[in-house]
Amino acid sequence: MSERINFAPIMSLQEFVDIRPSIEGYLVLTSGGYDPIHPGHIACIVDSKNYGDVLVVVVNGDWFLSNKKGVPFMNLETRCAVVSAIRGVDYVVAFEIENDTTVIQALEAIQPEVFTKGGDRVDADTIPEWAACQEYGIEVVTGVGDSKVHSSSNILEDWYNRRLRMFMPE
């Protein structure tokens, strides 16, 4: 018989803050746009669970992605649903704050013990939340998951070029 998969609950930042006092254990937070999600994202999320008891994944909102790379490929609701199905994820926080390209407000509100980053995010120059983590006493762990071999932007560019060739043959 196959094992039943329980999806992690998806909630707003305020909903998580409301239940935070009842959560016991060493809390780890990781974040990303996950648009589209790829094996590097999954490796970072799964590996993040090794740094604590409770894993919260903050999914950056559509404004963040629009500001970073244009129109999102997948909307926030869809990206949260996919992340909630990944093994080891305990909570998914849909995080949408316009005019902010960081998750500093989420870190301040959630107060995890650890903040993990994967890929090429390695120091204060590449992690805008670094100083806030130091201020709040949150340990930053870098290099989580696989090295930077996947890129959402590259995946989308390849997809676009294939579609272009399909409709506009040479």
Stretch-by-stretch model annotation:
Residues 1-170:
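Nucleotidyltransferase catalytic core that binds NTPs
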